[in-house]
């Protein structure tokens, strides 16, 4: 069977339109790439860079991107990094929800309009993950999600301090006059001890767990804390994997099936995921062409027990959840009890 031409060949090696090929080619050679890199059949891999100073939850991708690129090159691909619309949930309130769609639209335009054969979608903060998955569903080129991971566990006066969770508690204490302004700010700072997104089972951890449950990220990647060496390891492996996915023509439509969405609900229910997840998952499914409404959560998730004891519903934080096995252990438990589709 004839090997399928790479999508980027239309830009960089199209004898039918030498004029445009020359225009595309010469400008991509002005920063160190060689003609052979772009015309030898190597997949062009986009890295959707969601990290910036405006997006502190994802900021460490600025350093992780080198490791991602090394993985891509190791597997025989050519990395091309590009910025995404910045999203920081706490920095854009009360309009952060609108940024999900802005980020989605900007990703779609880049993925459609540029010579990209496959893409690594870097995620972390709440809306970055649904925006990335919606774009992957729409454009349907080989895509893989790479979460930046949660912060390390926070502590305040000897107790676990979960990002967000402790602030809601501090607001009550401040309103009652039990703490002053300075202590309020100290409590908030204690909950954010490192790089990474929220260390609770908030929307960020929940949506990245859903990406893993859908099959859109490497196994075990959702909950690795941002500063851990395993986060660098999975960044490298993700870079390698996307190159293989391009050669396999493994697109989101082959991964995000209806059964995969059902698995996402099973996992989300078991981990006590954020109540923001249903509208996000519905939107992702819609862009995948799958009718998957909110009613599925009651139908599929109603009898799934809560297996994860993490804040805000429970006691622990993400670092502890990772050490306990993370999402793979949850999926194994669900499989053992016939509450998860196999081979999806």
Task: For the regions a language model picked out, list residue spans one by one.
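Short, glycine/acidic-rich beta->alpha junctions
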Residues: 102-103, 124-128, 259
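Glycine-rich, anion-gripping cofactor-binding loops and their flanking helix/strand elements
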Residues: 93-111, 325
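A short, small-residue-rich loop immediately preceding and capping a beta-strand
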Residues: 111-132, 143-148
């Amino acid at each position: 069977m004839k090997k399928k031409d790479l999508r980027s060949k239309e830009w960089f090696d199209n004898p039918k339109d030498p004029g445009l090929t020359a225009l595309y080619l010469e400008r991509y050679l002005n920063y160190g790439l060689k003609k052979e890199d772009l015309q030898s059949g190597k997949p062009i891999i986009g890295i959707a860079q969601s990290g910036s100073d405006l997006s502190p939850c994802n900021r460490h991708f600025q350093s992780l991107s080198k490791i991602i690129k090394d993985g891509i090159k190791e597997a025989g691909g050519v990395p091309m990094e590009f910025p995404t619309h910045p999203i920081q949930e706490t920095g854009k309130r009360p309009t952060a929800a609108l940024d999900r769609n802005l980020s989605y639209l900007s990703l779609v335009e880049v993925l459609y309009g540029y010579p990209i054969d496959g893409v690594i979608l870097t995620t972390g903060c709440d809306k970055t993950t649904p925006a990335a998955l919606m774009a992957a569903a729409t454009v349907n080129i080989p895509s893989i999600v790479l979460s930046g991971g949660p912060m390390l566990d926070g502590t305040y006066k000897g107790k676990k301090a979960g990002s967000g969770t402790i602030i809601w508690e501090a607001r009550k204490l401040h309103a009652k006059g039990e703490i002053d302004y300075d202590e309020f700010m100290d409590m908030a700072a204690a909950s954010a001890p490192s790089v990474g997104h929220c260390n609770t089972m908030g929307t960020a951890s929940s949506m990245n767990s859903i990406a893993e449950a859908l099959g859109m990220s490497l196994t075990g990647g959702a909950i690795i804390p941002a500063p851990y060496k395993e986060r660098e390891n999975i960044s490298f492996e993700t870079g390698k994997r996307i190159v293989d996915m391009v050669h396999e023509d493994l697109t989101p439509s082959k991964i995000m099936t209806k059964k995969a969405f059902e698995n996402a609900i099973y996992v989300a229910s078991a981990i006590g995921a954020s109540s923001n997840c249903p509208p996000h998952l519905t939107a992702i499914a819609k862009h995948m062409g799958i009718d998957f409404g909110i009613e599925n959560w009651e139908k599929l998730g109603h009898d799934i027990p809560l297996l994860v004891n993490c804040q805000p519903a429970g006691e622990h934080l993400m670092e502890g959840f990772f050490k306990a096995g993370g999402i793979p252990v949850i999926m194994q438990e669900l499989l053992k009890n016939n509450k998860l589709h196999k081979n999806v």
